[in-house]
Each structure stands twice: as C-alpha cells, then as structure tokens.
Amino acid sequence: MLAFWQKEVGLPYEELLPMGRGLQQHRHGLNGSVLKINHAREPLGAEPRCGYRELWIARAGVAEPKRLVDPDGNVVVLVPPGHEDVSAIGMQLAVRDEAAFHDFYGRALELEPAGPRAYRCGDSRLSFARDPSAVVAGRMTASGYRYITIQVFDVDAEHAGILARGGSEGSAPRTLGSVARISFVRDPDGNWIEISQRASLTGPLPSDVKP
C-alpha cells in the first residue's frame, strides 16, 4: 500500500503517528493537504463503500487524466492542474439526494459553490453525482476512503455551528495530546468529516476540562 502511494502516485512520506488501539497513521504530503493511510493491526470488518469514491490530484506534467487503483481498490486520478477546476486536490462523491448534499455542504458547512454540483474548501474541490447505489456510510474504521479533514482555527466553535445549522454529530470535540483538537460531523449520507484544529497551525490547544 505505501509503495503504491509513494512510488506510483508520487506522494512524499511525512511522518508516522501512533493512534492507539492498534492503529498507526502514515501521513503523506498531498499538494498542501495530507493523505492519511491508517493501518490497523487487526483485520477490519466488511463495510460497503461510503460516498467518497475518487481522489483527484493535480500534477504538473500530466497531459491527461491518469486513473490508478490502489491495493484496497481505492481510485485515484492524476489530472493536469486546472482540469475540471481541480488546482490541488478534488474528491468525487456519490450521493443519494442532491438537494440534501447542497443543503449540508452549502449551508451547514458554509462552503463556497464551485459549480452546479461542487463546492470548494480551501484549495480542495468536492464534487458529486447522484448514484442509486449510494448507501448510508457505516463505521469509520473500515477499508477505503472513509473521511476527509477540514482544518479550522476553533474546532469547538465550528463544530457547534455546524450542528446548529443542521449537521449531524459524529463525535464531540476532544484533544489529542498536544497535537490537535478534533471532532467529527456526518453529512446526509453519513460520510465522516473530521474538523481539526492542529496546534502546529493554530497555536496551543484548549483543554477538554471545563471550569
């Protein structure tokens, strides 16, 4: 798996983070973002594919889209910069309900529209298409693309705001040592979205302990 992403896709390896409970996270640079490959010591249970279907990566020197598949069956497409408005990375989603997708990503997450079926989050582009085979996502600890991460400056405020605007909670904010404070929300199809306040970007983290 690591050889595929490092050699065939060409992502630089950044660091290994122990996650506890037999999980290790191999982090790779991804055009200003991070690809997290989480390795489990124990076999993962079977889960249907969630809505995250294809990762698009803008790559200088690529003349036309190049479709690759990793050992777990995840699709990654290398594209020329600017192809279908992807300047860094893009994630293609399969959804059950287009209106619900627009309401969540446009109103609850407050992302900027980037086309009739797309939204922009920083340098990343999230696009979707209705797919009758799409199902509600199950557990996050399963093989395949399982979650995306949005970096923020105040995870508690952002998490509360998303819930107030109709988003569903995946897990409440918690602090991971001195590295990050994170939470999870879920979109209308149950896809997991990590909200992350990383200390290296935002400074010292708040404590879980409330006065």
Describe these PLM feature segments:
Residues 20-27:
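Glycine/small-residue-rich interface belts in oligomeric ring/scaffold proteins
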